[in-house]
Amino acid sequence: NTRVIFCLRGMKTSFNTPHRNMVDFAHVPVIKRMTRMPVCIDPSHSVGTRAISSDGIPDIFHATAQGLVAGANMVLVDFHPNPAEALVDGPQALTLDELPLFLEDVELIRETYLKRQQNFKAVTKFHA
C-alpha cells in the first residue's frame, strides 16, 4: 500500500531520562529495505524536551539530523507559537521563530545525505 508510512517515534522505557522515549534511527535504512515503505522520524516525541546539548544545538535538532542522515523520507516535529500554552506536547515543541533555523538545518543534513549517497554509488566494492 503506497499510502502507508512507517513512523519511528521511540518506545517508553523505565529509564525515562534523558529523553522521553528510546529510539534508534539506525533502523531507518533497515525498515526501508525490509518494508519498502517511506520512513518518517519523530524527534519531538523521542526527545520530549527542548534540552540543549553542550555544543549549543538542541537535542531535537541532533535527533532530526541522525534520522535524516540515515535516509528518513520525512520528519514530524512539534511547533507551537507559545509552547507553554500548548494543550499537548508543549515541553517538546519548538517555537515558530525557530522554524527557519530548523528548516535550514534540515536542508544542510539532506544535502549531506545526498552527497553520501553519491559517494557510495561511485564505489563498487560495497556489496551486501
Where are each of the predicted segments found?
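C-terminal helical cap(s) of enzyme catalytic domains, especially alpha/beta-barrels
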Residues: 82-115
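Catalytic alpha/beta core domains of metabolic enzymes, predominantly
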Residues: 1-79
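General N-terminal targeting signals
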Residues: 21-23, 56-57, 92-94, 111, ...
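Flexible, glycine/charged-enriched surface loops at secondary-structure junctions
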Residues: 3, 74-78, 113-124
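Flexible glycine/acidic-rich beta-alpha junction loops that bind and position SAM and/or redox cofactors
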Residues: 14-16, 51, 81-90, 119-127
